[in-house]
């Protein structure tokens, strides 16, 4: 059994998008599934992770060769907005383009129920919800007090620290993050992640003026660390995960934060309907609400720990070992036989 697991523009795309692709390949490695990262029509299934023009070309060729095509729906026009310079302008033509691209697949994989519902207006291709999951191995050491001390000292942070992990873009709730920090001058806020969309020097040109202005004019207690080479260090340093994102397909950093026992404060959006308010997360819709939610946790260490424990327990269902069966079931269905034979 062989999967052609193609990720167009793999060398330039970073963040959760790339992490999801890595997770899929980790699952295949762990399950002993043969795959190639090239578009190969001699494979049993063509799995496309980014519907660029080359992917659509190979999807059409796959149909002619009677090779089933599955597409991962990492992108929607809505979550493309407020990402980088010109993204809002490009979001309008992107929607019909994605609708056309996704329609070339025999089956779609959606990272959340929310994304699956959004795609109802794109095409009528059958779809299955499969979480992006998270690789718990990359979080090893997050509970190491020495690593925590190193990252707190490196970024001049005093605990308890409110933190976020991910690309610094408007869609992730940058304005709310900065304003909430401004309202809470007694608390250190840290955003760990690329300041440029792709992380590179050239990508600085893609950063929107609004993003640049918000970062430049952020208050002294709001730190933007840039890329960190050991993500476990970010989770070691942080105490409350603050995710005021305006639109999200799933939110892999949220799953990782929950797994480390960091209680999450999130924006109350449809994507996070699966989180129980007051049980596994606190939710708010504006800066006033975020301030109240964060202070309620920062002022009560026992509640902070209790919510963190519940979040960690909830996250177990999203570990790679737990979501692997869902991904393989999609492959099984396309071939009408098990991808991994019983032993």
Residue ranges and their predicted role:
Residues 89-107, 212-214:
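Membrane-proximal helix-turn-helix segments that form the acceptor-binding/catalytic region
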Residues 134-153, 159:
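Acidic anion/phosphate-binding donor-loop and adjacent secondary structure
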Residues 227, 246:
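Aromatic "clamp/platform" in nucleotide-sugar-dependent glycosyltransferases that forms part
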Residues 263-266:
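Short hydrophobic beta-strand element within catalytic cores of glycosyltransferases
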Residues 277-288, 295-302:
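Conserved acidic donor-binding segment of nucleotide-sugar-dependent glycosyltransferases
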Residues 303-317:
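A short, well-ordered alpha-helix in the C-terminal region of glycosyltransferases
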């Amino acid at each position: 059994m062989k999967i052609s697991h193609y990720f167009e523009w793999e060398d330039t795309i970073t963040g959760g998008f790339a992490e999801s692709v890595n997770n899929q390949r980790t699952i295949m490695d762990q399950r002993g599934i043969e795959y190639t990262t090239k578009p190969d029509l001699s494979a049993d299934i063509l799995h496309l992770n980014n519907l660029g023009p080359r992917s659509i070309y190979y999807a059409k060729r796959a149909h002619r060769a009677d090779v089933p095509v599955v597409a991962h729906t990492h992108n929607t026009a809505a979550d493309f907005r407020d990402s980088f310079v010109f993204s809002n302008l490009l979001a309008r033509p992107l929607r019909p383009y994605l609708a056309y691209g996704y329609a070339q697949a025999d089956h779609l994989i959606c990272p959340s129920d929310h994304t699956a519902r959004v795609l109802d207006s794109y095409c009528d291709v059958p779809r299955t919800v499969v979480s992006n999951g998270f690789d718990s191995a990359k979080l090893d050491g997050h509970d190491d007090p020495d690593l925590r001390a190193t990252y707190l000292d490196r970024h001049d942070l005093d605990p308890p620290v409110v933190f976020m992990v991910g690309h610094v873009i408007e869609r992730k709730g940058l304005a709310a993050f900065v304003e909430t920090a401004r309202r809470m001058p007694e608390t250190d806020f840290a955003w760990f992640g690329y300041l440029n969309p792709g992380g590179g020097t050239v990508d600085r040109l893609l950063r929107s003026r609004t993003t640049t202005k918000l970062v430049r004019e952020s208050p002294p207690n709001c730190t933007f660390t840039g890329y960190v080479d050991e993500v476990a260090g970010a989770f070691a340093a942080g105490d409350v995960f603050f995710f005021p994102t305006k639109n999200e397909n799933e939110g892999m950093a949220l799953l990782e934060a929950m797994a480390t026992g960091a209680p999450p404060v999130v924006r109350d959006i449809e994507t996070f309907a699966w989180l129980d308010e007051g049980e596994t997360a606190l939710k708010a819709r504006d800066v006033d609400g975020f301030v109240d939610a964060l202070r309620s946790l920062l002022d009560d260490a026992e509640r902070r720990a209790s919510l963190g424990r519940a979040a960690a327990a909830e996250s177990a269902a999203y570990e790679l070992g737990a979501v692997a069966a869902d991904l393989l079931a999609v492959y099984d269905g396309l071939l009408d036989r098990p991808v991994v034979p019983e032993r």
